């Protein structure tokens, strides 16, 4: 299995990448290994207005680099080595937009844990599941934005949808911020955070604009609670206003083993 041998890059590597496994793939590939406690097939979350769909996919390669050519080169190697073994179902090319903004014009990832909060603690499994310590639960969703509807909103209304100022990223005051603002419903507690690695993507000729959500977490319970707050509401019905303009067309849970474990799995 070539993809198991390429997970550990040389220390001088210029770009990071991650190999991730869905529950069914883990069962088939590593039947003797045991399994991360929370790795299971994602069950859709259906609210009154919006649905976090569940879609298939056994493997995910998350490739990042400052130069798109490096991403292409590495993806080409993966594709060549896995020919006849897997069937590609999706390939999304993200890009950095306007100093970290999403396509909708607001800074993305502001709510990530700060450096002094130790992001590693929120993103990586610890000794609570010792056999898989150093790994991470990774949930991905591909969101398509209705840019016509979004751009029809005045900036002040867009800011109420997100809960932050558009041009300086300052959070709205509690008096200004609606209960269903995006950053209100996704804030489920200071001790319940994830690390986002979201990227915008676009195909202008097709009128397709979106955000590829990638959330790394030490426990999927946190991510699911966040999704339930967005799609069902807490209280029920107080759903994320951003979902009126953004539709999730995929939804899959993966697990990223640590470098050391993945090396062992590939032996």
Language-model segment annotations:
Residues 5-20:
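Short, small-residue-biased leader/transition segments that mark boundaries at the very start
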């Amino acid at each position: 299995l070539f993809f198991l041998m390429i997970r550990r890059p040389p220390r001088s590597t210029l770009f990071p990448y991650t190999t991730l496994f869905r529950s069914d793939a883990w069962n088939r590939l590593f039947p003797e290994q045991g399994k991360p406690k929370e790795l299971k097939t994602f069950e859709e979350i259906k609210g009154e207005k919006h649905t976090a769909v569940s879609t298939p996919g056994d493997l995910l390669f998350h490739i990042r680099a400052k130069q798109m050519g490096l991403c292409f080169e590495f993806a080409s190697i993966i594709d060549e080595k896995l020919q006849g073994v897997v069937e590609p179902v999706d390939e999304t090319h993200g890009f950095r937009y306007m100093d970290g903004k999403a396509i909708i014009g607001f800074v993305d990832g502001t709510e990530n844990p700060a450096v002094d909060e130790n992001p590693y603690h929120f993103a990586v499994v610890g000794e609570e599941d010792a056999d898989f310590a150093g790994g991470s639960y990774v949930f991905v969703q591909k969101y398509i934005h209705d840019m016509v509807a979004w751009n029809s909103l005045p900036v002040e209304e867009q800011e109420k949808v997100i809960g932050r100022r558009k041009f300086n990223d300052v959070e709205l005051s509690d008096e200004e911020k609606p209960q269903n603002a995006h950053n209100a419903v996704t804030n489920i507690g200071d001790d319940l955070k994830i690390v986002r690695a979201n990227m915008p993507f676009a195909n202008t000729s097709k009128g397709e604009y979106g955000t590829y959500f990638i959330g790394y977490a030490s426990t999927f319970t946190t991510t699911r609670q966040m999704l339930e707050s967005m799609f069902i509401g807490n209280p029920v019905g107080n759903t994320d206003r951003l979902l009126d303009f953004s539709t999730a067309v995929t939804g899959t849970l993966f697990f990223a083993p640590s470098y050391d474990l993945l090396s062992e799995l590939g032996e």
